Amino acid sequence: MVKNIKIFLSLFFVVVLGLLATTANSMVIGIDLGSQTFKVSLIKPGAFETVLNEQSGRKTISSVGWFKDERLFSSDSFSVWARNPKQNYNLIQAFLGIKYKEGLVEEISNGLPLGFKVKNDTVRNTVSIVYDDDTNYSAEELTGMLLRRVKDMASSYAGSSIKDCAITIPPYFTQQQRQALLDAAQLAGLNVLSLIHDVNAAALSFAMDRTFLEKNESVIFYDMGARHTSVSLVEFESHNEQIKGVKKNKTVSSASVKGIEWDEKLGGFDFDMVIVNHLKTLLKKQIPSANVDDIKITIKLLKEVGKMKENLSVNQQAQIFIGSLVDDHDFQATISKQQFEELSQSLIERSLLPLKKLILSTGIKLKDIEYFEVIGGGVRIPFIQQALKDYLKRDTLDKHLNGDEAMSNGAAFYAASLTHYFKVKEIKLKDILLNSVDVEINNNIINSGGAGETLLEETEDNEDNELNNSGNEQQQQQQPTINQGGLKDKKIQLFKVNSKLGIKKTVSFSSENGFSLFLNNPTINNPLATYTVSNVPTPGEKYNFTGKPKIHCSFRLTTSGIVVLEKAEAEITVSLIKPQPQQNKTSSSTSTTKKNTTTIETTDGGSEETTDETTTKQQQQQEKEEEEEVVVVEKVIEYIQKTIRVPLNFTIKYNGCVEPLSKELSQESNDRINKLDQVDRILRELRQERNNLESFIYETKDKLESNEEYLKCSTQQERDQLVEELDKTSAWLSDALDNDNTETEEYRKQLKDIKKKADKIVNRVSQYQLVPVALEELEDTVDKVKPMFEIASKDLNVTAEELKETTDKIQSVSDWVQEKKSEFKLADYSKDLQTSSFDIKFKLYDLERTIKEILKKKKKPVKPSSSKKDKSSKSSKGKSNSTDEKDQKQKEQKEQQQQQKEESQFQNDGAEEQQFEDDHKVHDEL
C-alpha cells in the first residue's frame, strides 16, 4: 500500500505539477496492449491515473468474440470461450502483419487452445481470420474492435472523447506488424502519436520521479509478459541546462537504450501450459474415457490454472476442482511447488537466455548494473526470480515499478511529451532499431557513377525523436561518404542495427533514368517495400542543363520503428538568362504625353486638351521622324548557372510483402465495424428495456406482498388485480424472451402500460410519503414568517386593513396546517387523500407570494419639522444646508438597508415559486 502511494505521488509531482494544458479537452492515453490483458493510463489536466473498466478493474482481458450472434468483449468474451471457441479470438495481435502458412495457428498458439481458423488473404498476402463460411475478418479489424473498446472505455472514464495515444509493442515486431497495428488503431478512431517498445516504456516510468545528476546509472529491465520475454539495458543521465531567456536552469534527463534482447515464444502462458499438461495426465488416469486433447477441456483447465499458479507463489501446493469436467465426472487434483519447478526446468533455462545475450552484446559487467528491475506477470513465479538472482549473484531483485502498469504509465507519459498542449518533465528517450535496413537500387544505374560517388547523409529528426521537443538542441548532421564501388553491388546499408530511432538519411547518386529502390531487413530476410521513382528530368525546353541529374532520396526512420521514403529529388544545374535592370522610362513617357496633346482655346477664354484626327496624323508623322533618328544598339544576353531540385514522383509496391490497409479497404473495414457497433447499441437498448420491464414486475410484486406502505395504501382487491396484470405482463415477457424478433419499442410499451395500471397504488404510496414532509415544511415556514412580519410591518406604507388581512392569512394557514396534520393521522390510506402534496405546496407558494408583495410597499415618508421647513425656504434663495442634506441621505440609506434586510428573507423564493407554479399547473391538470 505504501509503495503504491509513493508511485502515485511521484507521478503526481512529475506530471500534474509540471503539466500545462491549453485546452479543456487536452487528454492522452497510454495503451499497454498485452497478449492476455491490456492496461490504459490517462493523462489529463490535473490527473495521471489508470483507467478503470466497467467492473472497476485496472486491467482488462484482451479478447473479442461472438456468442449467439452477439459481439462480446473482454471478460464477457472470455467467459464463453469454452462454449464457442471457434468465434472467440485471443492472441489476435500475434496475427497482425504476418504471412499465411499452413499450421500458423498451432505455431502461434504454442499449445494454447485457439479454436478459430485462418485463411490466406491473397489480396494483401496476409491471414484472414474465419468467422463462418461467409464471413472473415482481418487481424486489423479484430484488433481495431478491441482498440475502439479501449477508446470508449477511456473516454467514458475521462468524461470526454480521447483520440491521442501511444501504444506499446514487443521489440521483435517487424515493420509490417507495426504498420498493421497503426492501421488497426486508425480503424478504432485513435491518433497514434507513436509506438513504443514495452520494456522501454517501463524505463520512462522509472525515470519520471528520478534525476541522475550525481552519476550515470545503468539499469536492466526484465519483462516477462504472457507471451514473450524482453530485456533492455538503459543508461540514464541528467544534466542542467539554462532556460532560454531566463536566468534559471532546468534538469534534462535522457534514457539511452544500449541494447534489447528477447524470446518471443516464452511467457507466462508457457508456464500455465506446463500445469495444464500435468493436469491432463492426471485426468487421463482418473477418467480414461476423457479426450484430453478436446479444446473445451483445455480451456476449462487453463482458466483454473491461473489461480493455481498464484497459489503456488505463496503456498507449497495448490488444488483444483472442476465439476462435471467430462460428462458427469468431476475432476480434482493437486500440484506441489517442487513439481511445478521440476516440470518447468527447460523454461527456466530459456528465461535466462535473453539476459545472457544482452550482457554479451552490450559488454556490460554485472557489477556495473545499478538496478535490475523486474516487471510483468511472469516474474511473479518464485523460481524464475531465484534463477535470475543466482545468475546475477544478487540477493534481491529490484521492484521499484508497478509490474502491471509501468508500461502503460510510460506510454502515456511518452504520448504527453509528443503533444503541444502538455509540458512534462524533460526526459529524452533514445530508442534503437533492432533490425538493420538495406536499400537496393535497380540495374538502370549500375554504371551511372564513379567510385565513391554515393553519399549517405544522416539527419537527426528533432520533431519526433526526442521525448521533449524543446528545440534546445541544434540539428545534428553527419555526412559520411560511403564507397559503393560505383554502385556495382547496388546495396547500401541504410540503417544499421542499434540506429537511433527518429532520424533521416539521404541516399545520393547520379542517374539519367527512372529507378527502383528495394528496402529489406537482411538479418531476418524480410522484404519491406519497393519504391519506383519516375519523371527524372532530361535536358530540353523546360530544363536547360547538361550532365546527369544527382538524385537525393530521403528516408525517415520514425519513432515507431518504420522506414519510409519521404521524398525523392533530382538536383540539376540549369542555365538561366541573367535578368537585365529595367530602364527608367518616366521622362520619355512624360515627353510623349506632352507631344500627343494640343491646346485649343475656347470661347470663354479657357483651354481644353483634345486628340482629334488632325492632331493624331501630325503625331504619327512626328513619331516616325523620331524613330528614324534612333541609333540601334545590340543587346548582350548573359547567362547564369543555378542549382535547383526537382521533386520526383514515386509509387510503392509490396511485392511478396504484407500490404497495409489501402484507403479503400480501410473504409470498408471501418464501415463493417460501424455496423457492428450499431447492432451492439440496438442490443444494449433492447436488453436495457427488457431488464427495466423485468425489474419492475419483480419489484412491484415484492412490494405488494411485503412492503408495509404498499399494504396500507391499497385494498386486497386492488392488489390482486394488479398482481394479475403483472402476471400477464410476465407471461408476455417470457414469450418475448423466446422470440428473437421482439423489438425494443414493444418492451418499452409494455412497461408504460403496466406502470399506468400500477399508478393508482404507486401514487397513494407517494402521497403517503410526501404529505407529512410538505406539511412540516409549510409549518416551519409559518413559524418563521410570523415574528418576521410583525417586525417588518411597522415600517411599511400599508393600511390597517391590509395589515390585518395579511396577518389573518398567516394565521389561517397555520390553522389549516394543524387541521390537515390531524386529518392525515386519521385518514384511510387505502383511498386517495383529500389533500395532496400539491395542495400543500400551493399553500406555501401563496403565502410566500403574499408576504413578498406586501414587503414591496413603499415606506411612510418622513415628515420634516417646521424649523426645517423655514430653513429650507430660506436656503432656496442661497446655498442649501449641506449638513441637513447629509443627515437626510444617511437616514434614507439606513431605511433602505432595513428594507433590503427584511426583503432578503424571501430573496431565494423566486425559483421555488416558479417551480411550484409549474407543479400547480400539473396539479390542476390532474
Swiss-Prot record:
Residues 467-479, 582-605 have a biased composition (Low complexity). Glycans are attached at residues 120, 136, 216, 249, 311, 468, 544, 584, 596, 649, 797, 881. It comes from the Eukaryota. It is found in: Endoplasmic reticulum lumen. One of its GO terms (molecular function) is adenyl-nucleotide exchange factor activity. Belongs to the heat shock protein 70 family. This is Luminal-binding protein 1. It comes from Dictyostelium discoideum. The gene is bip1-1.
